[in-house]
Amino acid sequence: MIVTLALMAMSQATPQQWPQHSMDRPRPAVVNPGPPPSDAIVLFDGKDLSQWRSDADSSAAKWTVRDGYVEVKPGTGTMASARGFGDVQLHIEWATPAVAKGEGQERGNSGIFLMGIYELQVLDSYQNDTYPDGQAGAVYGQNPPLVNPTKGPGQWQAYDVIFHRPRFNADGSLDKPARMTVLLNGVLIQDNFELVGPTANRQQPPYRMHPDKLPLKLQDHGNPMRFRNIWIRALE
């Protein structure tokens, strides 16, 4: 009994494979923390859309680049990254039109789709009422943000996202759901939220097995939204 308790205590004290304070444990990689970190992939540097494609047909992205930002050209379609990603840290800055037009979901609407499937809502949510799971910072249709720290129309705002993709078993069944943590303008708004499946409008589709890496997508929802300083770090 004493031996059993001792072994239990040891397993609780050192739950990982390395002994506490082991000098043999692999060191974390050293990165420059400047904007962006030195190990980040810059998806948009304010100059061109070489890292992006049209989602519809994989042709060159058709949004407008000017003055260090890219602006949605309504009607040209959603834009997808040229490469795929799974677990990531994402930084992206966005701004709604300076002159607010429309109400609810019609005002400054776009979306950031992790793996092209899991949407983090982009919306002008400054003094603009809509359903809570559709406002800025919501995991669309699933979870409202914890708080609303949005700025007024035309002001630059920033998302910092930690996303962990879902894991699937060999038979296609779900092993672990996707998880998302989000800061908006430095304020925590999604705290390791477990997604119940792909995001969708007025429906809740189940998880379906998909590749471990898929493109990031930025949505054309008919509003001239702006984005800048987009970088991403692979976490796997």
Regions found by a protein language model. Name each.
Residues 12-236:
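Carbohydrate-interacting regions of secretory-pathway proteins
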